[in-house]
Amino acid sequence: MALMTPQEYIESLRKLNTRVYMFGEKIENWVDHPMIRPSINCVAMTYALAQDPQYAELMTVKSSLTGHTINRFTHLHQSTEDLMNKVKMQRLLGQKTASCFQRCVGMDAILSLIHIS
């Protein structure tokens, strides 16, 4: 499977059957809502940088499970080098977004489960 582009990520959100409420009101077009869209844009940046030849080496890695190129956020770390690249990737995204890019907690939770199970 090819790496997802930022546009494909955003379109995948539009296809979800999601009900979103904010401040007691239902939000029909939550993907484009001005309070939600900045977070979506930050996640989209994780896909954009993976597509950019300048950052692809840092943002992507060969999967130890499939052998396919995957986004580093979905990679199961195998070495200290993987962990160092994770930190470098997070620093780069912090510089590019000046915000939380929303994927760290999920990545850390999955990696914790891998190591204890």
Question: What is each of the regions a protein language model found here?
Answer:
Residues A2-A48:
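N-terminal-proximal low-complexity accessory segments that begin disordered
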Residues I114-S117:
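Conserved small/polar residues in nucleotide/adenosyl-binding loops
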Residues N85, T97-L111:
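Short, flexible active-site-proximal loops enriched in glycine and acidic residues
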Residues M1-A2, K62:
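Unusually extended, aromatic-enriched hydrophobic runs near protein termini
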Residues D32-M35, S39-L92:
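Extended, charge-enriched "interface" segments that sit outside catalytic cores
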